[in-house]
Amino acid sequence: MRRDIVAIAGVELELFEAGNGPPILFLHGAGGFVPEHPYVAPLSARHRLIAPSHPGFGKSSLPEWIDAIDDIAYIHLELLERVGLDQVDVIGCSIGGWVATELATKAPKSVRRLVLVGPVGVKTGPVDRLDVPDIFALPQSALEKLLFHDPERMTLDPTRLTDEQLAIMVRNRETLALLAWEPYMHNPKLPHRLHRVTAPTLFLRGESDGLVSAQYLAAYARLLPNARTETIAAAGHAPHIEQPDAFARTVLKFLDAGAV
């Protein structure tokens, strides 16, 4: 895994790359990109995996002008130009799925196939009720029960983290609040743009996801012209982390089905 810092539009963007072959742009969720996670190896075995840390996450800088998820999509589009790619497959997890849909509405021809894993980004329910539980108001123990199929196995022990890792965790959470607090976890304009997405799209959800419900996912998928949904068993909001083998198999099968 290669790590670099790339300067784009005033952002010092942390960038991870691995493998060779058809390119995949991987857009991480609120926890950031962790190159040691087991799903990374199968994705990069036959593909070129390009995984930036969003501005304000990991070790990427966050200039003052970036104050919305929509802004991040433009940064990643410029990244694709910088690395010389006209078209990529895109995988987006949670808020990374939101970034991915924003990106796909702005440059439909740049996205060959799209995978959205427990994505947020749209409002599908009544205006007076949250579609996604308020993660900023929940105690950590309650949040972990919503995030994971098996919280006891997946919960991080903070005493085993380095000071740098703890600082990144705190920074990731602060950036998430800045970008997704108001309006909460959605862009009111995005549903009116999703008809522009031309890529075949796979919506993935862990069966025990307590943040993104099956109803929300289905309603989200109906907003795109060519989308379908699948469920990964024994997984919560991050199936790529809880069930990396099943996740990689499902995603690669979908991507390979469209290979020329």
Briefly describe each language-model feature range.
Residues 9-61:
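Conserved HGGG/HGGXW glycine-rich cap/lid loop of the alpha/beta-hydrolase fold
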Residues 39, 199, 213-222:
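Short alpha-helix in the alpha/beta-hydrolase fold that links the catalytic acid
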Residues 98-106, 112-142:
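Flexible "cap/lid" loop of the alpha/beta hydrolase fold
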Residues 125-130, 140-198:
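Conserved alpha/beta-hydrolase catalytic His-Asp/Glu region
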Residues 197, 203-205:
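Short beta-strand/loop motif that positions the catalytic acidic residue
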Residues 208-212:
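Acidic catalytic loop of the alpha/beta-hydrolase fold
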Residues 227-260:
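Catalytic active-site module of serine/aspartate enzymes centered on a nucleophile-bearing elbow/loop
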